[in-house]
Amino acid sequence: MNFKVVLAAAALLATQSFAIIGIGGHYAPGFGTKMKAGEIAPVADGIQFGHGGFDGTMQGFGIKLWIDLLPIFDIEATYNIQFGSYDAALYVDGVAEPLPLEIELAGTPFGKANPKFVASGLDVSITYPLTFIPVIRPYIGGGVTYHLNTFVLNQSFVQGIIDDPAISDMIKSAANKEGLDPEALQQKAQELETLGQTLKQKVQDKAMDEGLKTSIGGHALVGVRAKLPIIPIAAYCNFKYYFGGDYPKEVDAGNMTLEVGGGFAL
């Protein structure tokens, strides 16, 4: 009799520990991605351009929905967004200091700062639980990934922005600050602000024309999810390795992402 009670209690505990559906958010850094620096090269008469790169961890975050309705397999849908910052500057002939480019793109969660390469992806995964132990659920799986990547602020992109002679003249005028008195420097600061707004709009217009670079790939994953009985909160950790997908030529994708987070589970 006691043995039957133990079995019934264990079954109840397992049922309450595994949620049918859950939604959560997570920290999602990407590892191993590199962006090569671009050599300084002419983009207009008397103006050159160069950009830096990055090597290491791309910061990121994401959201996840999981469904445990199927008897053997579970389903996850995940959207991650990651970004890496790099330097970019214009070099005007006869001017000692470069003119840094600070880009503020509408529709991205970043303010005015160094340019950023932003990579995002929508994953649809099927996972297989390795055990059915109550409270904790390790699993393996894989699925399809829809990649969306932004442009890199490279030579050809900048060339398309400042091909207007009026823009080139604004850049040359705003960059030259040598030998100016305080009043003239204040005027230059106003010119730089106007130039920044003009370049911002130019970048946004060209970015809208180019759009996001999209492609299809896949991924494999290993992870674990934990949920206490009764309490409608779960924690999870996934490691994903991606394959396929197209990136700008300057970017060497590391293809590895860690997801650590939690959410509501019913």
Regions found by a protein language model. Give the residues of each.
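Alpha-helix-centered segments that form part of catalytic cores
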Residues: 61, 195-220
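Residues that define the transmembrane beta-barrel architecture of outer-membrane proteins
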Residues: 45, 55-61, 116-122, 136, ...
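Outer-membrane beta-barrel and related beta-rich outer-membrane complex signature
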Residues: 35-39, 87-95, 150-160, 201-210, ...
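Short glycine/proline- and aromatic-enriched beta-strand/turn motifs that initiate or cap beta-hairpins
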Residues: 18-70, 265
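Gram-negative (and chloroplast) outer-membrane scaffold detector with strong preference
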Residues: 29, 64-164, 229-231, 266
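Extracellular loop and loop/strand-boundary signature of outer-membrane beta-barrel proteins
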Residues: 45-52, 107-115, 204-210, 244-250
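Cleavable N-terminal export/targeting peptides
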Residues: 1-20, 170-196
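Predominantly the C-terminal beta-signal and adjacent terminal strand-loop region
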Residues: 36, 86, 178, 195, ...
